[in-house]
Amino acid sequence: MTVLSFIQARELVSTIEQEKTRARVLLDLGLTATNVDINYRFKEVEFSDSKISFKHLNEIANDGEICYYLEKRKSPQKLKIFSADTNLFYKLIPSRDAPTIEISGIKMHRTQERTPWQDTIDKISSLQPLKGRILDTCCCLGYTAITAAKEKDVTQVFTF
């Protein structure tokens, strides 16, 4: 699945304005760079698993509030869901690097003055020395578990 935010969309719009036929962008929550093709004849950007029209791309470029996902032959969809079981609303919020989850209006990471990765590093640093077995209790997007697992004296990370 391709995930886009205003950040990637603006990069692609800029590439289109420069009349380039190929771009390299981060489409998997900031993990790896991917080459995409720009088709001026059909006015769309072609990803390995989907396409998006220039019109929809511009709409996403102007929406800094939420991430979108793309599926074959469908319009971009906002990454959001309401759980009737918990009565909570979840959505994926973009930031300068990795996104964060917002649960009923509360962001799980700071995103104004810090990025989610920086926020996670701050939290882990406040717990030093970190060693042995670690319990991660939130398990939103895994930033804390990933960061804790990289600490040299941590032997295991449990999440739930």
Which sequence ranges carry the predicted segments?
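Surface-exposed cleft-lining segments at the edges of enzyme active sites
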Residues: 106-112
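N-terminal auxiliary segments of SAM/dcSAM-dependent transferases
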Residues: 1-95
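Conserved alpha-helix/loop element of class I SAM-dependent methyltransferases that forms part
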Residues: 114-133
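Conserved SAM-binding loop of SAM-dependent methyltransferases across substrates and taxa
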Residues: 140-154
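Short, basic/glycine-rich phosphate-binding loops at helix/coil junctions
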Residues: 98-106
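Class I SAM-dependent methyltransferase core
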Residues: 136-138
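Conserved SAM-binding motif I beta-strand of class I
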Residues: 155-160
